[in-house]
Amino acid sequence: MAKQCEICGKKPLVGNYVSHSNIKTKRVFNPNLQHMRNQFPDGRIKTITICTRCIRSGHVTKPSIHKGS
């Protein structure tokens, strides 16, 4: 699923560039997607593509860091 948030499903929207002379040209508004490692409740860790709103809202859990000895 390219250019789509795996949690909320946010994807690109279509809009227009509007010039000073009011000429409209199609454009795409892409969501701000980030790749982030997520720890699921069952303990497994997976890299997912999510939007920044889901990161700020706390829908993901960062995995704990274990340093080797």
UniProtKB/Swiss-Prot annotation:
GO BP = translation
Name one molecular function that GO assigns to this entry. structural constituent of ribosome
InterPro entries, alphabetized: Bacterial_rp_bL28, Ribosomal_bL28, Ribosomal_bL28/bL31-like_sf, Ribosomal_bL28_bact-type, Ribosomal_bL28_sf
> Pfam family of this protein, just one?
Ribosomal_L28
Query: What are the record keywords, sorted?
Result: Ribonucleoprotein, Ribosomal protein
Q: Which branch of life, at top level?
A: Bacteria
Q: Which family does it belong to?
A: Belongs to the bacterial ribosomal protein bL28 family.
In its UniProt entry, what is this protein called? Answer: Large ribosomal subunit protein bL28
